[in-house]
Amino acid sequence: KNLFLDTASILEERIVRGSYTMDVFGGQNLEFGAERAQTILDSNLALGLFSDTEAPSSAFGGLSPVAIPNANTRVEEIRYEPFAIHNWRISPRMSLETSFVYESSEISMSGDVSNSRNFDFFKPKVDYRFDVTPQLQLRVLIEKFVRQLSFTDFVATSDQEDEDSNTLAGNSNLRPDYWWNYNFLAEYRLPNDQGVVSANFYHHRHKDFLQRIDVSTGPDDLRSAAGNIGTGDMQVF
């Protein structure tokens, strides 16, 4: 035996959400509320390898312990999200939905890594729909998305896919990536309910995009980790 790999993790999540909906004017209603979420990850990783120079340990399957950065870490996020959503039936053929969401969160780490950071995002949305005819509908959507971070990207984990690496490094400095979505959609319903033909064009403008990055310390220590690689634009038709 020349490899010992032991992982253990516990993920907990608690969410409380409340909202209230009221009619304000003819064809309009307003929903407002708030959400609070707590997410906790306790992660542990142990790696043992055969070595002629390092002393073996029974806790590592009789192999020599290998020090892994960020292997025993607790990650916790507290997130608050107040919101307001306005729906307006302008006419039998037109509708408009607007929403305003404010996200405030604190992500803290303890254990092998000690770190605490705060993030604040404003996430508006405008969704306009127009029925040109009973068969043809046009839709314009503008929305800001903020991706929720995967807590396993913060800590070191085992690598099940790369034969050249036993572990994936964690990144304690990750930031949520976000993007603006500009979407135009046309949908046509075929006669006699034979189906739907649709065309969709959208443009995404990304910020702090998340991707795997190389964090190898040398040719004999190949590692990758999740990281923010910058900005970019994507267009799809």
PLM feature spans:
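Face-selective signature of the C-terminal outer-membrane beta-barrel domain
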Residues: 1-111, 115, 131, 236
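Flexible, surface-exposed loop regions and adjacent strand-edge segments
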Residues: 1-3, 47-57, 113-119, 154-164, ...
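Hydrophobic, lipid-facing positions within transmembrane beta-strands of outer-membrane proteins
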Residues: 12-18, 78-84, 122-126, 138, ...
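Outer membrane beta-barrel strand-and-loop segments of large Gram-negative receptors
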Residues: 13-19, 63, 70-71, 171, ...
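Residue-level signature of outer-membrane beta-barrel architecture
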Residues: 20-22, 88, 120, 128-131, ...
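Transmembrane beta-barrel strands of outer-membrane/channel proteins
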Residues: 32-38, 98-104, 128, 140-144, ...
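Surface-exposed extracellular loop regions of Gram-negative outer-membrane beta-barrel proteins
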Residues: 40-42, 106, 134-181, 201-227
